């Protein structure tokens, strides 16, 4: 009776991890040999682990990663990809996020840029940072709608609070003047305070021409490329490789 009352109180306090551990202890005879301090310590440890797990789940749901299973441990380092394992390991530490620096992934279509961006995004979530993935074209569609319904300022504020904003397929489609202005607004709110990840088939040296407006291009690239980590990805299409391996299996 007392045990059930304690469980009910723990759940009422939203100490779900501790409640589960307490219930487990009551069914294990080995727990009786532990001291009071040891048992309490185990309960607290379980609660902390439970909260960490729930927080990670919330962050990953909010991130909306295109490849939610991508993780840095599964990155392939074939020589043809040109990835430096030491650089990747450094990026996996997420100091670039803590220092509000950006990450630019460039390479041919299918080379795995989006997957890598999602892997770094998941790693950032693991370390407690908020992440959001969006394709560039989709972002500007949403911002155009936000202008129309009066939610643009609120949406900008939301984007400004995200620790790691992943902009996928940069340079794939031309931007109109309104989109270029919106892009500057988004990046200006983030410079020096938050990190932005870019994936692009377009080589970095072509970005200025893609943005068309020289003045805006200078302002946008200054905010984005300054102190950015650049990770070029080489090699054949990873999508074709995966299909080929599936066919051979």
Curated annotation (Swiss-Prot):
InterPro entries: AAA+_ATPase, DNAC/IstB-like, IstB, IstB_ATP-bd, P-loop_NTPase. CDD domains: AAA (cd00009). One of its GO terms (biological process) is DNA replication. Keywords: ATP-binding, Nucleotide-binding, Plasmid, Transposable element. ATP binds at residues 105-112. SMART domains: AAA. GO terms for molecular function: ATP binding; ATP hydrolysis activity. Pfam families: IstB_IS21. It comes from the Bacteria. The keyword DNA damage does not apply. Belongs to the IS21/IS1162 putative ATP-binding protein family. This is Insertion sequence IS408 putative ATP-binding protein.
């Amino acid at each position: 009776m007392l045990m059930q009352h304690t469980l009910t109180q723990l759940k009422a306090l939203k100490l779900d991890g501790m409640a589960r551990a307490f219930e487990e202890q009551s069914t294990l005879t080995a727990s009786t040999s532990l001291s009071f301090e040891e048992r309490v310590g185990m309960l607290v440890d379980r609660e902390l682990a439970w909260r960490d797990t729930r927080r990670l789940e919330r962050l990953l749901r909010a991130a909306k990663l295109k490849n939610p299973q991508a993780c840095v441990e599964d990155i392939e380092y074939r020589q043809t990809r040109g990835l430096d394992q030491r650089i990747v390991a450094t990026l996996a530490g997420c100091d670039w996020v803590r220092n509000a620096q950006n990450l630019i992934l460039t390479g041919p279509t299918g080379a795995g840029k989006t997957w890598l961006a999602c892997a770094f995004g998941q790693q950032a979530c693991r370390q407690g940072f908020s992440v959001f993935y969006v394709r560039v074209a989709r972002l500007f569609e949403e911002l155009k709608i936000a202008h129309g319904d009066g939610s643009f300022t609120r949406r900008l504020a939301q984007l400004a609070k995200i620790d790691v904003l992943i902009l996928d397929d940069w340079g794939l489609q031309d931007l109109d003047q309104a989109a270029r202005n919106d892009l500057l607004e988004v990046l200006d709110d983030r410079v020096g305070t938050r990190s932005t990840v870019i994936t692009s088939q377009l080589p970095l040296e072509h970005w200025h021409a893609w943005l068309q407006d020289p003045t805006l291009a200078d302002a946008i690239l200054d905010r984005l490329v300054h102190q950015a980590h650049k990770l070029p990805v080489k090699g054949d299409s990873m999508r074709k490789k995966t299909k080929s391996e599936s066919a051979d299996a």
